[in-house]
Amino acid sequence: MEPASLEKDSQPPGQANTEKANPGQGQANAGSASPDEAATSHHRHGSPKVGSLEHPERIENVPGHVIPILRQEFDDFDTESTRFLRGELDGEEFTKFRLKQGVYGQRQPDVQMVRVKLPLGGVNPDQLDAFAAGIEEYVPLRKGHITTRQNVQMHHVPLPDAAKLIRELGDAGLSSREGCGNTMRNVTGDPRAGTLEGELFDITPYAGAYVRYFVRHPTTQSMPRKFKTAFAAIYDEDNAITRIHDLAFLPLVRGGVRGVEVRVGGGTSIMPRIAPTLYEFVELDNGEYLKVAEAIVRIFDRTDWLRANRARARIKVLIDKIGIDAFRDLVEEELTGDWVVERDFSLDPVRFDHDEEANAPAKPDSYATANGDLREFDEFLASNVRRQRQAGFCTVEVVVQRGDLIPDQFRGLAQIMRDYTGGYARTTVHQNLVLRWVRDEAVYEVWRRLSELGLGDAGAQEVTDVVSCPGTDSCKLGITSSMGLNQAIQERLVEMQIEDELTRRIHIKMSGCPNGCGQHHIANIGFYGASIKVGEHTIPAYIPHLGGAYEGGEVRYGERVKARLPAKRVPEAIERWIRFYESERSDGEEFNAFVARVGTPEFESRVKDLAMPIEFNLENMNYFVDWSKNVPFEVIRGEGECAV
């Protein structure tokens, strides 16, 4: 659906020239895959609905089935993991193989993390049931974790069980293919795409085509480093935070033609960059965006000097070195290559076409109304519910604390989806779940059902909805227990009983190391894990950032605060900063504007005593133990496998 009145012909940000506006003009746009690529790229020249020996992938345009399942991969994983456990296969060779199937080593020996990719966060009720069953059977901690890239991860899985788990999840159409390693990672997007007021069109079919085009693509199997892509649903809103990604697509319409602005070279970690504009407008329906994307990844894949230092092997490093204009020249040259005429960029074989509206729930004959709990429901309604552009429907955002769900919650959510959404939901980059196509009349019943599962909290994407990565709970690169700190901060914020509307808009995020998986760079108040040496002992600590932003189409990285706070003092620091903001701000002044006006030194001065040295003794022993842990803290960092 594309409302004519919403057509956007205005010039987007970036340099304007005809070369940028029309990449690869005159280049061939169709063809067939070369024979040596047929086994892995048949989806670029055909779309069989049922598997066969020649075309084993099955493409189904049903919710949650974006990535075609290839069952031979499960057989291969069984075989190779058995060989490895018998000592018949080299460890490094097996690790590379394992990562492509989304099975990742943890800081704990002999167990794995299984990462299931959910393109644009899409998941259906049967798949939530499959997660519940798999977690009960194979995951010792009995929980699954929604990540900041809309995946679901399961931790502490023994290798033989990981082989069984990915196969059983595959039976439900869930894929971990290329969930790890130097591959095309999960493609993320706005969880409300297709339902938003102000949308030019639904980006979902085009994002789905992108996923299908590049999964198992020969060029993306062993790149210098991982490659992350995101699709926005609305250019000026960008709830997918596309600008921090390696490759970003933002929707536009020009002259009635659907297209995207293409940005490339974003990223966080120790070298944060906002992706600059490569092309202001690239067409979608003719497959031009797939052609441009392949040119980009081909250049990235063969830039071998990036492989010399894996800490600086992302595409942002290349663009930082040569500049976006020089990179555009490389793309234009790449688009003249012979490979272009050997490809079929038609979207017909790979588009993810599914009419959600046709399957949306009917209006109920009767429905419950608030009874003695109106205040709590009104809070939920104000913060978690958003009206869809389709009359009579809304989306409901479920707050999932720390992104963790237990089997009963997976199953309960599945049943709510069946009863009230037509079966539609998507995870978010904030570790929540958005229920789509909920009838306006059914929202109260949905809230009551969510509350029975412990998932009825109000405050979605507000100050109490704290985001963090797994940290030292499982990650080899983790320095601190970011999940433990998340819980401590969330509990402190709830105790503060914050009712101020401007304060509730503050976003707090943390990562267990500088890499940024917890999005600390773009939070209003962000932290990353560090440490403080006290003689032979070590205190878990955090480095704060202030003033980050990602809403309203703007991305800004926060400013580092010159303080190293012991982990156990971080909740106190947050409370002081919030009270400082509430007492000293101007009328209607947002938190980031306040930070910019008063400066970070003012914030530093208010926690100076919290950053003072701590003597190691029995009275202070608590500071030397991390949140949610019961042993003295020490920095134990392994070698991350994401760049193996």
What is each residue range found by the language model?
Residues E2-V644:
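Peripheral terminal and linker regions in Fe-S/redox and tRNA-modifying enzymes
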